[in-house]
């Protein structure tokens, strides 16, 4: 959980004066709770082309609840992703969560070691007609949270089974609490 909470609350584009390491320490000692819907904290950052970019930071206590949900249900995530990727040749991407060597962060948006990691696009392109590129930097705030459970067990089954006791339902609830209950 430390990688998500202490190093994952603020995106890399924010000035490095912002840190959630002390907030992580506070959460470990106090375990704050937030059972209500919260809003993002907005921050306008200037892009290198002199155009502002709106960056929204989740309410820290709601984000802590989301991190706790992920941490407490990690086995469910592991089992799901194992089933989904078993037998796949390409399992590593530059943005998926993975342990970085000698770092506490869980993920980094652009890995510096592309020489070591390799660039699988060329291998994936062989025999393909198209290469799709996507900027997911603004995906999370606009993501439909129910899509999480739909992706895990299927839309129809998720709609029937709404008891909220499964790990993916808990993740859905915590995700909605971060952005106005949406």
Task: Tell me the role of every PLM-derived stretch.
Residues 1-181:
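Conserved two-metal-ion catalytic palm core of "right-hand" nucleic acid polymerases
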């Amino acid at each position: 959980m430390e990688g998500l909470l202490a190093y994952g609350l603020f995106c890399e584009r924010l000035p490095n004066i912002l840190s959630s390491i002390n907030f992580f320490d506070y959460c470990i000692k106090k375990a704050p709770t937030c059972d209500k819907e919260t809003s993002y904290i907005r921050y306008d950052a200037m892009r290198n082309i002199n155009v502002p970019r709106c960056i929204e930071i989740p309410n820290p206590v709601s984000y802590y609840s989301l991190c706790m949900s992920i941490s407490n249900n990690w086995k469910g995530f592991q089992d799901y992703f194992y089933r989904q990727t078993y037998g796949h040749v390409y399992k590593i991407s530059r943005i998926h969560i993975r342990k970085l060597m000698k770092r506490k962060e869980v993920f980094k948006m652009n890995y510096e070691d592309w020489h070591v990691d390799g660039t699988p696009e060329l291998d994936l392109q062989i025999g393909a007609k198209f290469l799709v590129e996507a900027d997911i930097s603004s995906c999370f705030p606009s993501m439909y949270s129910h899509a999480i459970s739909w992706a895990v067990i299927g839309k129809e089954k998720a709609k029937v089974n709404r008891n909220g006791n499964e790990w993916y339902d808990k993740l859905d609830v915590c995700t909605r609490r971060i952005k106005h209950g949406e």
